[in-house]
Amino acid sequence: MSSQAEPSKGASNADPNEKVEKMHLPTDTAGGGVKVKVKEQEASPSDKNNLNPQSAGVSEVQVQDDTGARGSGARDLKVPKQMQAPKSSEEKSDVDGVPTRPVSERELRKRDAMQFIQRHQKVRNILAQYCPWLTDERLQLCIELKILFMQHFQDSRLVLYTAVMSFLFGYLRFGFLSLFIIMAVCIQYYRICDRRVKVNFKDDYTRYLSTRKLENDSETVTWLNTFLQQFWYIFEPSLSERITEITDQILSENVPSFIDSMALSEFTLGTKSPRMGFIRSYPKTEEDTVMMDLRLAFSPNDISDLTGREIAACIKPKIALDLKIGKSIASAKMPVLIEDLSFTGNLRVKVKLIDKYPYAKTVGLTFTEKPVFSYILKPLGGDKFGFDIGNIPGLTTFITEQIHNTLGPMMYSPNVYELDIESMMGAAGLNTALGAVEFKLRKGDGFKDGLGGAVDPYVVIKNSADRVIGKSKVAHNTGSPVFNETFYSVLNSFSENLNLEVYDFNDIRSDKLLGSAVLPLATLEAMPVTNDAFVELTLKGKTVGRLNYDMKFHAVVPDSGEEITKVDGPGVLQFTVHQCKELSNDPSKRPTAYAKLIINNKEVYTTRKIKKNNNPSWEESFGTLLPEGKNATLGVQIFTEESEHPFGTANVSLQDLFAATKTGLLWFPLQHAPSGRVRMSVMWKPAQLNNDSISSMALATPIGAIRIHLRSANNLHSKIPGKKCDSYARIMSHNTKQFRTVVIASNVNPFWDEYMYAPVITKHDIFFLQVMNYNSSGEDKLIGQTPINISNFINQGENGALMEYHDPRELTVPLSSTRGIKGNATITFKCDFFPSAVTTSLSPDVTPAPKASSTVATDKVNIEVLPESQKTPTAVDNTSTSRGSTSVKTSKPKKISELLMPSEAVNAALDFESGFMGFDIISYKIAKPAQELAIFLDDLPHHIFLSSALNVTGGATLHEYGNTFIRQLEYSQCTFKLLDGDKEVGSKTMLSRDLISKGATKPLEIAFPDGASILVAFRLTPVPVKLEEVEMYENMGEMTVDVIKATDLPAADSNGKSDPFVVFELQGEEVYRTKTHKRTLNPTFNESFEVELPCKQTCNFVANVFDWDFGNKDDHLGSCVIDCKLLQQQQQTNYEIPLDSKQGVLYLRITLSPKWVLRSKRAGNSSLVEGILGQTASIVGMPLKGISTVGNVAVDGVASVANLTNKMRKGISRGFKGIHHEKAK
């Protein structure tokens, strides 16, 4: 017996007189042994000076068994949370040394009461129906009394029965002997009950003890090792053959350039099977989870447990790898041998069970400690002259570390190696398919190379797994190619994307990437059809062109439980080529092969090349939609590098291959080939073809609205050296701009403090909050963005209804580029989610109600109906469908617009104060061509919709859709402007409530003064929203300020008087200046002016009193801040405000009149005027098409060029008045 002292982990806190040693015994289990704890007794003070004190010694010895089941000391690894074993009730009381929170008696009673009510839910439902007065507390009391009565009755019924029967027998005068009959019956009944109680208790207790034993102790599995040994003789040859095939294929694909070929010439694992030292189970896992620890050992050199006959027939493991170095004649083979393999390790296995084939969904594997490897490696000399490099000092350690470094990130704790058994067994794949996506690529435009020349573009379409599902034809020498090609892709989840990449074809050099785009497929769930849509292509953050496409979703037929026996009608197909065998009869010839999949005589997919392998294995599939599968034909063509012609082909009808897949007959001979066979299979699911043609984001009903309170951004950087950012923020979703803020000029830390609303179409939506750098003379640049996953804000109640979500925290997150690179810039915002209130009564005649995609904030570029969700959205134009789905024809010719609703639904929607207003510009009538229609809403300075050019005089059908969010329907106003270049031809303002009430049941005609008119249909999807006070209509308006007088002003002149005047500033900008009153300390002004108040909660309104001086700077007499929060709508508010100079009082009277005030005025002199035309003459929103802009003019949105001229006039006038005044003196 050998011993080795190991310090205890808790030695620092232990008794210094205690010593713990681990005694390693020659046990069967590696790492086993016993722990010996020795407690020594200190010597008495009188014996401390003696060399052998009598009082010192060992006072206590404890011996504890320590098996290897719990790890092996230094090699123990941290177990990840998902692989941790469940703790027993005793262990749960203290986790990692931290005691759990004590539970009060009140909490225990409340929890027990809830569990009690749940157990008696049926009784509760019945009593609630007939006894509504019976509360949960009373019900619990009644049931407890009933249980108590029944318990005591069961305990005492035998005594009661004995007494009653004895009384009856005596009363009937049966005599004394009758008591023996009663006693016999009672004794027999008692024995039966007693036996049943003992048996049940014994079974329960035995089960409890076995469960505890499974939890705490490991189990030897000699029976399993015996079975593995017998099974190993049969299984090992086929396993070694399969490993050889797979390894040869991997080696052939990864041959270094200086090696001609690599192949396994010999591979065997020997005749001795792997063994399990122990198994430890964890019975307290979830019902659908199995977890256990295994002690695995593979030591074929240990023959101590084999019989003489087994030793004589024993074959040891051996791996021989042949390397062929050099080329042709100058090549030479070099064998590499690996012998005497052994392995030992502790493996934790976690199996997730399911209730269908293959009944195990995933298997998680992780080593709880580093395994131990042993081997003999002979890279040179072979069997006879081979030298084991393990004898070289340090090399074995180096190789072992490399093995651990390779396997560690894969399956050493805390890493877990998960096997998807369901997918591996073929149960996933097409079984989980939701349907197929039909993608029709129409055309593209705007493509050019770096020098502006012509290109030869083609488009590659990939799925989310980056697998190519189609490649378009090459359009030569054109920047506006026309494709008109259709591609299909199997859709397994609505969270998938289509990736579009446009390349410039070149015969000599490699093809050049012109641009890429991502089409998220999330909105196919709500809007299965998208027609005539555009998507912007970007390259390094810049727009380089766009593609025009149609997209449809074809859903599979729901599974009825019946087995599909034949292929008929439309369906989703998954065609798989597995492998080929025996391509060459000569083993020395190893062809490099690849396969092409053929569907209906059309090549649809090409596999990867397998180098120098006689039995290549691809296991590659191609999924598509077949409009008719009954007469479809499938085929596989095998090609080799030696020839451009097919080496062999295999053709079969879809019906025959489907039947062969059912029976497992998957091997087919290669025709026109000297040898070889191919294994292929097919899966089929019937589908429903979608023949709808109408599609627009404005027709998709939002499930709710997301509100983003955007506070600020920090550390922004302009890409133009030496210039600060003119920044604004916007919300992107479904490749569409949903909302945007005002531009803050020349500020790297802009502060917006704006509320933005955007529609949520599906729970898979992803919004991108982007910060842009405004450029008046070119395209706006993206500074950075951050994604917002709407699924994080959606919660459902017990009945499945969506619930509101409010996060009181403000999030500050870094901004990243389109490539995901994060910088120093950050953005601060807060999100809320409000579900829509759409009911069945609000649904239209058509499919579930339509509702706007979004719409607000337009830009310089416009797009037609945008597709959908996002990954890295490109800056497609304005909101919801600016220049929207143009010229979309309705599928029902009798219906004027898809937005129209029944009058009952309209009245129900108008009961709500907020929601998304969708609109359909059905047709127009103009007298002059090349005009445009712009729509403005409430306090938004940017148009929410901009139509395409109206070129047809007289009248024409348009059908362009848009959508916007209405905050307060009672006060909301919508303005329609007809534009001719930079000139406003006509304008019409109406209440949004009137638009919906008159235009939701039938189209509403809106006429302009010059005889032009438009026909519009509306729809309201109500979304109840609790507005913040700063958003409300009552919080803004037009102030009428009466400057009455000032008293007791301080003297600034030598004569003891002052020449006072007052300057009023709103948000840091001068809005009014009173007249100057000479030589007085108590001036009476009696002046009045009007100014717009954007927000009485946040605006800073200041009055500054000055003393006028000729030729010198005016003296400041004092100032005061006017509290606008005191203002009430349509009421006069009197102010008597002392100046901050502690002398002087200013008297004002202010009246606030309700009015929508552009939110661009809230930023004061930090906002940037982006154009010269907007809702008012003094401020504009987004630059409209064809309208000139004033770039980088930092004004406040209140003062215009006329205001600047007025200041110059007043300054000159005051100068002349001063000169005249001095002369008068």
Swiss-Prot record:
Its main location: endoplasmic reticulum. One of its GO terms (molecular function) is lipid binding. GO terms for cellular component: endoplasmic reticulum; endoplasmic reticulum membrane; plasma membrane; plasma membrane of cell tip. Residues 1-15, 43-65, 869-890 have a biased composition (Polar residues). The modification Phosphoserine is found at S843. Residues 217-422 form the SMP-LTD domain. It comes from the Eukaryota. The keyword Endoplasmic reticulum applies. Residues 413-534, 559-668, 685-803, 1019-1137 form the C2 domain. Its cofactor is Ca(2+). Residues 1-104, 867-890 are annotated as: Disordered. Ca(2+) 2 binds at D1053, D1107, D1109, D1115. The keyword Phosphoprotein applies. One of its GO terms (biological process) is ER to Golgi ceramide transport. InterPro entries: C2_dom (IPR000008), C2_domain_sf (IPR035892), C2A_Tricalbin (IPR037761), C2B_Tricalbin (IPR037765), C2C_Tricalbin (IPR037762), C2D_Tricalbin (IPR037756), SMP_LBD (IPR031468), TCB1-3_C2 (IPR056910). The chain crosses the membrane at residues 167-187. CDD domains: C2A_Tricalbin-like, C2B_Tricalbin-like, C2C_Tricalbin-like, C2D_Tricalbin-like, SMP_TCB. Keywords: Calcium, Endoplasmic reticulum, Lipid transport, Lipid-binding, Membrane, Metal-binding, Phosphoprotein, Repeat, Transmembrane, Transmembrane helix, Transport. Residues 16-25 have a biased composition (Basic and acidic residues). Ca(2+) 1 binds at D1053, D1059, D1107, D1109. It is a single-pass membrane protein. It is found in: Endoplasmic reticulum membrane. This is Uncharacterized protein PYUK71.03c. It comes from Schizosaccharomyces pombe (strain 972 / ATCC 24843). The lineage of its organism: Eukaryota, Fungi, Dikarya, Ascomycota, Taphrinomycotina.
